[in-house]
Amino acid sequence: MIKNGLPHEPEFQQAYNELVSALEESTLFTEKPEYKKVIPVVSIPERIIQFRVAWENDNGDVEVNNGFRVQFNSSLGPYKGGLRFHPSVNLSILKFLGFEQIFKNALTGLSMGGGKGGCDFNPKGRSDGEIRRFCVAFMRQLARYIGADTDVPAGDIGVGGREIGYLFGAYKQMQNNWYGVLTGKGLTWGGSLIRPEATGYVSFTTLKKMIEKATNGKESFKGKRVELSGSGNVAQYAALKVIELGGIVVSLSDSKGSIVSKNGIVPEQVLEIAAAKLKFKSLEEITKESVKLFSGENSVEYLAGVRPWAKVGHFDVALPSATQKEVSGEEEAKALVEAGCKYIAEGSNMGSTKEAIDVFEANRSNNVWYAPGKAANCGGVAVSGLEMAQNSQRVQWSAEEVDAKLKNIMYTCFDNCYDPAIKYSAEKNADGLPSLLKGANIASFIKVADAMFDQGDVY
C-alpha cells in the first residue's frame, strides 16, 4: 500500500487506508498508472489553521479552547465542510473528516472542495450566553480565513442552527458585509429549505436505491425492520422517512445508551425526542419524563451504556447515524450479519471500523450490501451547496425545487458509485453485488485527480 507515515493519527489513517485500499484493489492503477502520483499530494492538506479561543464564562472567568480549520483541497471549489464543537475534537479527527469531505463533495457533482474545522469546546451544560460568547470568540479567530469563495463552513456535532446564527452574526459584524459564508442558516436570513432533514432523508434514499437494485425492484422499505443509531438530526429524519414508507424503526441511541422497540418506534416518540434533544436531554431522561408516551403498546426498553446493534433480534437494515467508529468488527458487525441484516448505509462519517467494513464486504456474496458515508450521507452537504448557489443569486428556491435538485444529485451519486464498482472491479466473481465502497472511492478520486492534473497540482 502507498504509505502516508502518520500512524499517530488513527482516524485519518483509517480514512486514508480505506481510499488507497479501494483504489489498489481495483484495476484503476493498472489501467491508468498516472493516478498513483495523486495520492501523496491529495493526502496532505493545503493548509491547517490552529488557533486559541479565549472566552468568558458566566462567572466572569476566562476559559481557553483549541480551535482548528483544516482546508484540505480546493481543486473542485471553495473548501466546504462542517464545524464540530465537542471535547473529542483533535487534528486527527478533523483531518479524517476533511479528507472524507473532499471525496464526498466530489460525488455530489457540485463545485465544492473539502475541509473541516471545530473546537474541543463542549456545549453541553453551557448557558445560552456562554455559547454565544464562545461563538463570537471562535469566529473572531476564524473570520480572516473564510469567505463565500474561499471556505464555507457548516454545522456538525455541537453546532446547530443556534450556533450557526451566532457565528454568522459575529462574522457579519466583523466584516461589515453579508456574504453566504456559512450554510445551515435560518430560512429568513439565507438558509435553504430541506437543509435540516437532508442528511437523514438522503441516507434513506441511498438505502431505498440499494434495496431496489438488489431485488430488481421487487422489494421496498415496506415491512423492513430498520436499526438506527443516534438521535440527532440525521437519525430523527431518517426514522420519520422510514416510518412514512412502511418500515419499522426498532432502535435509536445516544452517547449514554439505546432505546429498542419490538413493535417499532412511532413518529410521536421521534418528535418528542427531537424536542428534548434541543435541551441536551438524554434518551434515559426523555423516556422517564414521558412515561406514558414510551410505554404500553408503543413501549421501548432503555439499555444503559450500550449501542443497539446486537440488542434487537432480527432486522433487515442498519443505518449508523451517530458518530465515527460506532460499529465494531468482531462483535457488532458479525452480530448485524447474523441478525439477518442485508443493507448497511452510513448516516455518520466513518460509522464503521475497518474490521466492521471487512466483515460487510466479505459477506457481499451472501447479499449483504454496505454503502460508506461518503456515498450515503452526502445529502446535507449537497443542500449546503444548493444553499451557496441560492445565496450567490440572492434568491430562495421552493422546497419542491430543492427536493427535485437533491433527488437528482443523489440518484446520480448512486449510479456514479455503482458503475465504476463494476467497471474497475478486479474481483474474479463479479456477478454479485458490486462494492459501493470501492465504487464511491474510485468515482470521487477520479474527479478530484483529473482536476488536480488540469490545475498543475500534479504533473
Curated annotation (Swiss-Prot):
PROSITE patterns hit by this protein: GLFV_DEHYDROGENASE
PANTHER family documented for this protein: NADP-SPECIFIC GLUTAMATE DEHYDROGENASE 1-RELATED (PTHR43571:SF1)
Name of the gene encoding the protein in the UniProt record: GDHA
GO terms of molecular function: glutamate dehydrogenase (NADP+) activity
Residue stretches in coiled coil: none
Alphabetized InterPro entries for the sequence: Aminoacid_DH-like_N_sf, Glu/Leu/Phe/Val/Trp_DH, Glu/Leu/Phe/Val/Trp_DH_C, Glu/Leu/Phe/Val/Trp_DH_dimer, Glu/Leu/Phe/Val_DH_AS, Glu_DH, Glu_Leu_Phe_Val_DH, NAD(P)-bd_dom_sf
Active site: 116
Protein family (similarity comment): Belongs to the Glu/Leu/Phe/Val dehydrogenases family.
Single GO BP term: glutamate biosynthetic process
Protein name: NADP-specific glutamate dehydrogenase
Catalytic activity: L-glutamate + NADP(+) + H2O = 2-oxoglutarate + NH4(+) + NADPH + H(+)
EC id: 1.4.1.4
Keyword terms: NADP, Oxidoreductase
SUPFAM superfamilies cross-referenced by the UniProt entry: Aminoacid dehydrogenase-like, N-terminal domain, NAD(P)-binding Rossmann-fold domains
Superkingdom of source: Eukaryota
Assembly and oligomerization: Homohexamer.
Any one of the GO CC terms: cytosol
UniProt cross-references to Pfam families, sorted A to Z: ELFV_dehydrog (PF00208), ELFV_dehydrog_N (PF02812)
Organism per entry: Schwanniomyces occidentalis
